[in-house]
């Protein structure tokens, strides 16, 4: 059965302009940009490369939050830096910890604009026995209007800067005590994986996401392996190849349907980049192999996309693509038109896909009680009513 869901037309929404603070943060700058910034505040050309490398180490290896911590930088240089720049990251407005250990942070983004217009995003840390995954946002809000996703009900406000994206990783390390110091010379390794699966469509903010992930994966900095970084897209086809060529991280596709007519409803971007184009881009993805499989995310919606015929079509669609399929039980939110598939049906679907030769794990919902599960993120810029929050928590507790 296909639900007829009204979807808004895909239109370009006017974005608010990012206003940098009076003293901009150095977080998010490349080494070359750091050297250029140092030149702008009077550092001699012969010293810029060395000073930039010092700053890089203190920011991304040691997690320094103030220039005063940078003990191998001269006092005069530290004073000059403090006069013109900061190493600020987003401000933690609220932290929630789920019964399952998942943590969600509401982050206010530094801005030179009126504080009343400050924007907020959410990022989520999911601890597991063998890894710790940080779910990072790329935009304030989202423009895609995916009908099953809570974030899609919030208008797109603006793109995040590279610094605001890297800053989310740094905030997580701050809060978890995950930086290198004398007590933990190798770090605690609590944040081992990063997924660009938070608020927004990463490939509609490609340059900032690229620049941020190159910092996150830099071996002389934050140092998370590219194989442990996954970028999820709803299918912005022109930037998929660029992701492989320019960033080189793992790719995930928010698929959710095997027929164009249904995907047009669930993921309206499909009307611009239909399944045939999307899957060809996946076949052509640089570096894809059995060792670097593309993940296809598939939310399980009762009576909508969960039949065995859907499973058969899914297997046929992915033929020739090194892939695995993540089956995601639908996470409820107030006002949603959908229900989660019955567990028995999810297992049948998974078994069929597995027997066809594809890994098909069912993602365990995490953080539902703090609105941190897949598809539930929505910044406080557009607050839920008390009634909506109570309804959502009730769903989480009874699920």
Swiss-Prot record:
UniProt-annotated binding residues for S-adenosyl-L-methionine: 200-201, 232, 254-256, 331
UniProt xrefs under PROSITE patterns: RADICAL_SAM
Superkingdom of the organism of origin: Bacteria
Gene Ontology biological-process entries: rRNA base methylation; tRNA methylation
Keywords recorded for this protein, A-Z: 4Fe-4S, Cytoplasm, Disulfide bond, Iron, Iron-sulfur, Metal-binding, Methyltransferase, rRNA processing, S-adenosyl-L-methionine, Transferase, tRNA processing
Required cofactor names: [4Fe-4S] cluster
Compartmental location: Cytoplasm
Catalytic activity: adenosine(2503) in 23S rRNA + 2 reduced [2Fe-2S]-[ferredoxin] + 2 S-adenosyl-L-methionine = 2-methyladenosine(2503) in 23S rRNA + 5'-deoxyadenosine + L-methionine + 2 oxidized [2Fe-2S]-[ferredoxin] + S-adenosyl-L-homocysteine; adenosine(37) in tRNA + 2 reduced [2Fe-2S]-[ferredoxin] + 2 S-adenosyl-L-methionine = 2-methyladenosine(37) in tRNA + 5'-deoxyadenosine + L-methionine + 2 oxidized [2Fe-2S]-[ferredoxin] + S-adenosyl-L-homocysteine
Molecular-function annotations in GO: 4 iron, 4 sulfur cluster binding; metal ion binding; rRNA (adenine(2503)-C2-)-methyltransferase activity; rRNA binding; tRNA (adenine(37)-C2)-methyltransferase activity; tRNA binding
Record text on cofactor binding: Binds 1 [4Fe-4S] cluster. The cluster is coordinated with 3 cysteines and an exchangeable S-adenosyl-L-methionine.
Gene3D superfamilies for the chain: 1.10.150.530, Aldolase class I
Catalytic residues (UniProt): 122 (proton acceptor), 374 (s-methylcysteine intermediate)
Miscellaneous notes: Reaction proceeds by a ping-pong mechanism involving intermediate methylation of a conserved cysteine residue.
Name of the protein in question: Dual-specificity RNA methyltransferase RlmN
Species in which this protein is naturally found: Rhodopseudomonas palustris (strain HaA2)
């Amino acid at each position: 059965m296909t639900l007829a869901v009204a979807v808004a037309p895909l239109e370009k929404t006017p974005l608010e302009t990012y206003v940098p603070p009076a003293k901009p943060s150095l977080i998010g700058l490349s080494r070359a940009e750091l050297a250029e910034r140092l030149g702008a505040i009077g550092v001699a050309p012969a010293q810029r490369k060395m000073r930039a490398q010092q700053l890089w180490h203190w920011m991304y290896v040691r997690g320094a939050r103030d220039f005063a911590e940078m003990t191998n930088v001269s006092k005069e240089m530290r004073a000059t830096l403090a006069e013109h720049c900061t190493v600020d990251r987003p401000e933690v407005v609220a932290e929630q910890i789920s019964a399952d250990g998942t943590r969600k942070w509401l982050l206010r983004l530094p801005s030179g604009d009126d504080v009343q217009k400050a924007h907020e995003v959410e990022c989520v840390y999911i601890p597991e026995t063998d890894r710790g995954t940080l779910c990072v946002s790329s935009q304030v809000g989202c423009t895609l209007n995916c009908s099953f996703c809570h974030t899609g009900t919030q208008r797109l406000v603006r793109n995040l800067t590279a610094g605001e994206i890297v800053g989310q990783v740094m905030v997580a390390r701050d809060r978890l005590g995950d930086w290198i110091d004398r007590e933990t010379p190798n770090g605690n390794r609590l944040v081992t994986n990063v997924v660009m699966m938070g608020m927004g469509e990463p490939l509609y903010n490609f340059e900032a996401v690229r620049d941020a992930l190159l910092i996150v994966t830099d071996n002389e900095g934050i140092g998370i392996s590219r194989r442990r970084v996954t970028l999820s897209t709803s299918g912005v086809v022109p930037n998929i190849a660029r992701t492989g060529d320019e960033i080189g991280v793992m790719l995930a596709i928010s698929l959710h349907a095997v027929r164009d007519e249904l995907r047009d409803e669930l993921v309206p971007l499909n009307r611009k980049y239909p399944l045939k184009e999307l899957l060809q881009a996946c076949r052509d993805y640089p570096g894809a192999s059995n060792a670097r499989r593309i993940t296809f995310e598939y939310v399980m919606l009762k009576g909508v996309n969960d039949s065995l015929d859907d499973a058969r079509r899914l297997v046929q669609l992915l033929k020739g693509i090194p892939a695995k399929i993540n089956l995601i039980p639908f996470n409820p939110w107030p006002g949603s038109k959908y229900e989660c598939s019955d567990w028995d049906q999810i297992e049948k679907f998974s078994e069929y896909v597995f027997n066809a030769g594809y890994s098909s794990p069912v993602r365990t919902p995490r953080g539902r009680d703090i609105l941190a599960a897949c598809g539930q993120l929505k910044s406080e810029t557009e607050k839920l009513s008390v009634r909506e929050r109570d309804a959502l928590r009730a769903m989480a507790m009874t699920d």
